[in-house]
Amino acid sequence: VVAVDGVSPVSFNLASGSYNVALRHRNHLGAMTTSSVALSSSSTAVDLSSAGTSTFGTSARKTITGTFPTQALWAGDVTFNGQVKYTGSGNDRDPILTTVGSTTPNNTVSIYSTRDVNLNGQVKYTGSANDRDPILVNVGSTTPNNIRQAQLP
């Protein structure tokens, strides 16, 4: 994670000390370090993508396997309420349909939005690379009624 210029380190206007570091992103559930991290005026690396970095809660990050295994934030919190939910009231799937036009689910909208779950610059409800499927996968494809909760205090 870098500052909004894309290269500079993130800085906080805080006194030097030990802090738990938490990270949230547009439509992802946040993750936080279990242990406090010493922060000061010099840069400190906190690698939440590393399986070796312990996080608060249970299954706070998604394990990505394959050629480049890593840990990632859970995508799909379209409603920004601290949960990823595929079915039922207040789910994260319906706002995607609303964005593309409820009566035209095949539409694609190019926009910066919390409803762009796969972060490709488009909101898409059906077809390949749609924003609905990652929500289903992240709650459990065979258990669409599950709800994935943020693991932040």
Model-identified regions with their sequence ranges:
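Cellulosome-associated attachment modules in secreted, modular CAZymes
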Residues: 1-153
